[in-house]
Design a protein with these regions (language model features):
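Sec-exported extracytoplasmic/periplasmic mature domains
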Residues: 19-23, 42, 46, 121, ...
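Bilobed "Venus flytrap"/periplasmic-binding protein-like clamshell domains
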Residues: 1-19, 31, 77-144, 219
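Short helices/loops that flank or line small-molecule/ion binding pockets
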Residues: 35-49, 62-63, 95, 140-160
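An extracytoplasmic/periplasmic, membrane-proximal ligand-sensing/linker region
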Residues: 3-13, 185-187, 191-252
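Stable alpha-helical elements in mature extracytoplasmic
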Residues: 10, 14, 33, 37, ...
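Pocket-lining segment of extracytoplasmic ligand-binding domains
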Residues: 100-199
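Acidic, polar ligand-binding/catalytic clefts
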Residues: 31, 39-96
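Extracytoplasmic small-molecule ligand-binding "clamshell" domains
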Residues: 1-57
Length: 252
């Protein structure tokens, strides 16, 4: 699965598919930060969104998220965080990055912020104590580009997005090297606002979970590197909750 910021046209096709099948007008809205999208959902100003697994696991009650479906990619409804460095760099493990420049994606990102902070906490460090400088790229492809061009020494990114570019446009991923991968987490879910009608929630859920049986749906899914959508399981997001709890307990 790839994020809307990187693939506007493919997600536009997905929304048009839902709109046509359900006779319900949908428009694609993008914002710079995850927090902005989450707040729009909380206020009921948008109906549905693909959101990061981090905010879903930790703050779904606050924002009123209700997960309808999760993408299955390469046969699994999971994704990982990849710690990447430039392929010509001498860095082979997290500890080698002490005193270097690191790029997070978004402050609320699971793979692009929470995971590397958790890794550092395990060695009794924080981003400020460990890195010389940190920056926020606000998208995974920006982080990949920054590492490839040596604008930063390392970054933590969504493994699905790295794999998408490595397969379809490896210009920059081939300049990077993955030195660490996280455990699997539940993939970013499709969620709806608490204000959406129950009937529409059911209709959207049914449609998106069966689109892999429709030729047009298959074409759209293939472009997004999604096999199909399945119902979410809360246990897939428990490891994320545990990371939040660990960071809160340790003060890291």
């Amino acid at each position: 699965m790839i994020s809307p910021k990187e693939t506007f046209i493919y997600y536009q096709e997905l929304l048009e598919y839902i709109s046509k099948k359900l006779d319900y007008d949908l428009q694609l809205i993008q914002r710079k930060t995850y927090g902005e999208i989450n707040e729009l959902l909380r206020k009921g100003e948008i109906d549905l969104a693909f959101i990061c697994s981090g905010p879903y696991a930790a703050r779904k009650e606050l924002y009123g998220f209700e997960a309808l479906a999760v993408p299955v990619i390469r046969g699994k409804p999971f994704y990982q965080s990849y710690l990447i460095v430039n392929k010509k760099s001498p860095y082979n493990k997290l500890e080698d990055l002490r005193g270097r420049v690191f790029a997070f994606t978004d402050p609320e990102s699971n793979t692009g912020a929470l995971v590397p902070k958790y890794w550092l906490a395990l060695i009794k460090e924080t981003p400020d104590s460990f890195f010389h400088e940190i920056t926020y790229s606000y998208s995974h492809n920006n982080s990949i580009l920054a590492v490839a061009k040596n604008l930063v020494d390392a970054a933590s990114v969504d493994g699905h997005i790295w794999e998408f570019y490595n397969r379809n446009n490896p210009t920059y991923t081939e300049e990077t090297h993955v030195i660490k991968k996280s455990i699997p987490f539940g993939s970013p879910p499709l969620v709806v606002s608490r204000y959406l009608s129950e009937k529409l929630k059911v209709n959207i859920s049914t449609l998106i979970q069966t689109m892999h049986t429709d030729p047009q749906g298959i074409r759209i899914l293939n472009k997004l590197m999604i096999d199909r959508f399945v119902p979410p399981e809360e246990e897939w997001y428990q490891p994320i909750k545990k990371m939040y709890q660990y960071l809160s307990f340790t003060g890291k």
